[in-house]
């Protein structure tokens, strides 16, 4: 039976965390103490130092030789059961997909164990439950987050192969990825593919970042590599940040001019910018053979309302899309007056600026759209249809039928048999090629993540020191403690800043939020209870396992979802709204299990 003293211990452990979160929220939302840039700096400190050192502190001080293997088996079995059910659903059901498998797996099995679980369970069940939570943290950081990265990169690789090599994927013998490419997801970084056919007829692919996404192109003019006369540019730092990091899959306005654009690409050319756009200046007009080619789309449009497709510049200049006639005329007139070209740039990854000030629908009445040739941009035909209030899993089937109808029209226009075109599935490269590609990308992600090092080093140190009774030097111990002690409060403070920067607490609509909360707080604990019974957990261990499964959503899965653009609004709502309702829900579980 739960006593008043037990309830007070729980509140003593949890209220300070919520105080830190509310202070951060008020500092941005009510008192305007921190700007978004300052919040970004605080969040970066938390991500690079506070949380990794907090994780290292908990793991290094936990004795791995006293781990409860049955409790770990229950947690592992729960995740494997959920993963097996979701995998079967994605393959057998028309409504299933890899994206939903990843999202539902995150919602149901990956709670916020480090920040919320350890203090909450210690307050409920004592010190031994804190040790159990540390064991869960170790498995999450080393195994389950790595598995999620594997699934995300597999999705990115599949999208890359499907879009770039729809008919020749089976003939790919190797895929080499440049060192500066850290993700295969075209929404995050604009990437290009180059192919080479060897004598045996096999295709060898090289994946690299496109010229438009390379960070060094923005500094070429200051380094003296510009091919044009230096002149003041109105491309601001904010726009550079927004070009590289906005997640909105819609064209966004940018105010830099065409001369800046060519200087960034760094290509010397024997024709002027006016020739490229067919602008005739001077007393004697002369014809331009570029305008005719640029005005023709390279591929036929599948539907009347489809976005314009890209033509080609002489390589390596980016391609210019054929905009509607009004847009083309406006751009030409503006250029004749010496005005700057107003460009639209497809943006592809996550940005707090774009989250708060999200752009609207594309408007081609004022400018031409500019894209890089062969750039991976999955956003153009993979709009996040799940982030709406009227969402249902059935929408996927409707959208699939719409897409098939568009493909059928395109195939009919090209004189092909649409039924045959849709019947043949896209082949994939050999398993060895895909496995090597994904492992390389996951490895690059892991070595850039400070939590990977903190977890592994903490585990190795605990194995050594508890085996031979070593003690960490006092200088090192206190250096780590002074930061790790602040880690818990700073993590909650950072979460409060994140909540304050969002335009809506429920970003995905009420219906989707209800589904997400049901998966997080009902389905997850239910599967954990079944797995715990299966491995023989009883008594207090069973209670700890169920309450641990009912913790709010983990932050790392949301970071991955935002980075790879896989239902980020759902995970954002699960983190924010879940944190607000987690305390009463876990208290209900605690009281019911204690009856």
Swiss-Prot record:
<feature type="topological domain" description="Cytoplasmic">
    <location>
        <begin position="28"/>
        <end position="38"/>
    </location>
</feature>
<dbReference type="GO" id="GO:0009921">
    <property type="term" value="C:auxin efflux carrier complex"/>
</dbReference>
<feature type="compositionally biased region" description="Low complexity">
    <location>
        <begin position="411"/>
        <end position="427"/>
    </location>
</feature>
<feature type="transmembrane region" description="Helical; Name=8">
    <location>
        <begin position="517"/>
        <end position="537"/>
    </location>
</feature>
<feature type="transmembrane region" description="Helical; Name=1">
    <location>
        <begin position="7"/>
        <end position="27"/>
    </location>
</feature>
<feature type="region of interest" description="Disordered">
    <location>
        <begin position="281"/>
        <end position="335"/>
    </location>
</feature>
<comment type="function">
    <text>Acts as a component of the auxin efflux carrier. Seems to be involved in the polar auxin transport which may promote adventitious root emergence and control tillering.</text>
</comment>
<feature type="binding site">
    <location>
        <position position="555"/>
    </location>
    <ligand>
        <name>(indol-3-yl)acetate</name>
    </ligand>
</feature>
<keyword id="KW-0813">Transport</keyword>
<feature type="binding site">
    <location>
        <position position="556"/>
    </location>
    <ligand>
        <name>(indol-3-yl)acetate</name>
    </ligand>
</feature>
<dbReference type="GO" id="GO:0048830">
    <property type="term" value="P:adventitious root development"/>
</dbReference>
<feature type="topological domain" description="Cytoplasmic">
    <location>
        <begin position="92"/>
        <end position="100"/>
    </location>
</feature>
<dbReference type="GO" id="GO:0071944">
    <property type="term" value="C:cell periphery"/>
</dbReference>
<dbReference type="GO" id="GO:0010315">
    <property type="term" value="P:auxin export across the plasma membrane"/>
</dbReference>
<feature type="topological domain" description="Cytoplasmic">
    <location>
        <begin position="153"/>
        <end position="455"/>
    </location>
</feature>
<feature type="topological domain" description="Cytoplasmic">
    <location>
        <begin position="562"/>
        <end position="574"/>
    </location>
</feature>
<keyword id="KW-0472">Membrane</keyword>
<keyword id="KW-0812">Transmembrane</keyword>
<comment type="similarity">
    <text>Belongs to the auxin efflux carrier (TC 2.A.69.1) family.</text>
</comment>
<feature type="binding site">
    <location>
        <position position="114"/>
    </location>
    <ligand>
        <name>(indol-3-yl)acetate</name>
    </ligand>
</feature>
<feature type="transmembrane region" description="Helical; Name=10">
    <location>
        <begin position="575"/>
        <end position="595"/>
    </location>
</feature>
<feature type="binding site">
    <location>
        <position position="51"/>
    </location>
    <ligand>
        <name>(indol-3-yl)acetate</name>
    </ligand>
</feature>
<dbReference type="GO" id="GO:0042803">
    <property type="term" value="F:protein homodimerization activity"/>
</dbReference>
<dbReference type="GO" id="GO:0010329">
    <property type="term" value="F:auxin efflux transmembrane transporter activity"/>
</dbReference>
<dbReference type="GO" id="GO:0005886">
    <property type="term" value="C:plasma membrane"/>
</dbReference>
<feature type="topological domain" description="Extracellular">
    <location>
        <begin position="122"/>
        <end position="131"/>
    </location>
</feature>
<feature type="transmembrane region" description="Helical; Name=3">
    <location>
        <begin position="71"/>
        <end position="91"/>
    </location>
</feature>
<feature type="topological domain" description="Extracellular">
    <location>
        <begin position="1"/>
        <end position="6"/>
    </location>
</feature>
<comment type="subunit">
    <text>Homodimer.</text>
</comment>
<protein>
    <recommendedName>
        <fullName>Auxin efflux carrier component 1a</fullName>
    </recommendedName>
</protein>
<dbReference type="Pfam" id="PF03547">
    <property type="entry name" value="Mem_trans"/>
</dbReference>
<feature type="transmembrane region" description="Helical; Name=7">
    <location>
        <begin position="480"/>
        <end position="500"/>
    </location>
</feature>
<dbReference type="InterPro" id="IPR051107">
    <property type="entry name" value="Auxin_Efflux_Carrier"/>
</dbReference>
<dbReference type="InterPro" id="IPR014024">
    <property type="entry name" value="Auxin_eff_plant"/>
</dbReference>
<keyword id="KW-1133">Transmembrane helix</keyword>
<dbReference type="InterPro" id="IPR004776">
    <property type="entry name" value="Mem_transp_PIN-like"/>
</dbReference>
<feature type="topological domain" description="Extracellular">
    <location>
        <begin position="477"/>
        <end position="479"/>
    </location>
</feature>
<feature type="topological domain" description="Extracellular">
    <location>
        <begin position="538"/>
        <end position="540"/>
    </location>
</feature>
<feature type="transmembrane region" description="Helical; Name=9">
    <location>
        <begin position="541"/>
        <end position="561"/>
    </location>
</feature>
<feature type="transmembrane region" description="Helical; Name=4">
    <location>
        <begin position="101"/>
        <end position="121"/>
    </location>
</feature>
<keyword id="KW-0927">Auxin signaling pathway</keyword>
<dbReference type="GO" id="GO:0005783">
    <property type="term" value="C:endoplasmic reticulum"/>
</dbReference>
